[in-house]
Amino acid sequence: MEQREIKYLLTMEGNTESFEVPVFARSLEEATLQAEQYEDAGFVVTRIRPEVKA
């Protein structure tokens, strides 16, 4: 059985503001690995959470 991808939101912070970037992953662990790529590029990731649909 294939596991579908979930939309996660990464919260990143800069010097004066924070913003959210969507990533698609099969698990929180996979989303964390994607967040590490942003950190390697110089961004500060402060939160990873699944998208909550209203």
Curated annotation (Swiss-Prot):
Ranges annotated as spanning the membrane: none
Signal peptide start-end: none
Keywords associated with the record: Bacterial host gene expression shutoff by virus, Bacterial host transcription shutoff by virus, Host gene expression shutoff by virus, Host-virus interaction
GO biological process entries: symbiont-mediated suppression of host gene expression
Protein purpose: Acts as an inhibitor of bacterial RNA polymerase.
Protein name: Bacterial RNA polymerase inhibitor
Organism: Enterobacteria phage T3 (Bacteriophage T3)
Keyword Cell inner membrane (UniProt): no
